[in-house]
Amino acid sequence: MEITNVTEYDAIAKQKLPKMVYDYYASGAEDQWTLQENRNAFARILFRPRILIDVSKIDMTTTVLGFKISMPIMVAPTAMQKMAHPDGEYATARAASAAGTIMTLSSWATSSVEEVASTGPGIRFFQLYVYKNRNVVEQLVRRAERAGFKAIALTVDTPRLGRRESDIKNRFTLPPNLTLKNFEGLDLGKMDEANDSGLASYVAGQIDRTLSWKDVQWLQTITKLPILVKGVLTGEDARIAIQAGAAGIIVSNHGARQLDYVPATISALEEVVKATQGRIPVFLDGGVRRGTDVFKALALGASGIFIGRPVVFSLAAEGEAGVRKVLQMLRDEFELTMALSGCRSLKEISRNHITTEWDTPRPSARL
């Protein structure tokens, strides 16, 4: 049967993958309320389409930190992709490059920055956690720079790992044939099996709980790469991020895997956008499964979106071809949404093209 939308890959991945692996990718924190809400909140935003506009030519191109991409749909960092498919991050990198968009490589990838760079040309960002051993951080950043990565996406919502109960039940550990490639030779490559979630105990020992805004400034002393602060959900933190020198913000709740009962990212987006006053770009990840979702995020002020789970699920189902198809389906749906809303370019997508539950009722138009 032909796959006609992004969500269908979820069920295929669930069939194909070992339970421990599928659950690791699919689950959220605790009650998983935010996990559902990331999707549900999109469904409560409705369109106000404009009609009788010539939409014979639609331009979806945009620039992110000065890099031109084919569409405002990018690949978010997701860990350990070789658990999904033997080609892992290699396949994702090639698919993103073929789609003319940006891939963000996770620190906890099962392929190294050098290996991903070797797949060929492409605009790539590197996701970073700050470790207690700052020397490790410096080495990772240097390697990403040397491998031609163009920006650092600094994850700031993980001073501790969220409680993902399925990982505890499954005693999640990295399968024995795989390793966290960026840490090879740093004595951090292999995770031990633990009676809790193996990842939790591994990370608990490595991630620095003292991480603060001064570390964002420290990072700028060791690299010239632009820094995206990933995990901002409030206007207050958006303003501080700008003061701290961030080149951009990613509104993210870590795929609902950290603190449960935070709002959906699409619900938090507008507050963050308003706080930044256009000084730096704001991006969003979390819950994007349709081209309509992409349009809604842009209408609320996002400069682009990132997708995570759809990438690993399509990777599990069909390898590189699956990831290519997900990016193509979202592109096609987004283009159709633009046409049916009367928008010919991204700059024509406005707040007036949508209505949200927190909008005040509009005065009725007088003839």
Swiss-Prot record:
Gene symbol of the encoding locus: GLO1
One Gene Ontology term, aspect cellular component: cytosolic ribosome
Role: Catalyzes the oxidation of glycolate to glyoxylate, with a reduction of O2 to H2O2. Is a key enzyme in photorespiration in green plants.
Binding site for glyoxylate: Y24, Y129, R164, H254, R257
Annotated positions binding FMN: 77-79, 106, 127-129, 155, 230, 252, 285-289, 308-309
Annotated protein name in UniProt: Glycolate oxidase 1
Reaction(s) catalysed (UniProt annotation): glycolate + O2 = glyoxylate + H2O2
EC number: 1.1.3.15
Active site per the UniProt annotation: H254 (proton acceptor)
UniProt keyword list: Acetylation, Flavoprotein, FMN, Glycolate pathway, Oxidoreductase, Peroxisome, Photorespiration
Molecular function terms from GO: (S)-2-hydroxy-acid oxidase activity; FMN binding; mRNA binding
Record's subunit section: Homotetramer.
Site keyed Involved in determining the substrate specificity of glycolate oxidase: positions: W108
Pfam families: FMN_dh
The family this protein is said to belong to: Belongs to the FMN-dependent alpha-hydroxy acid dehydrogenase family.
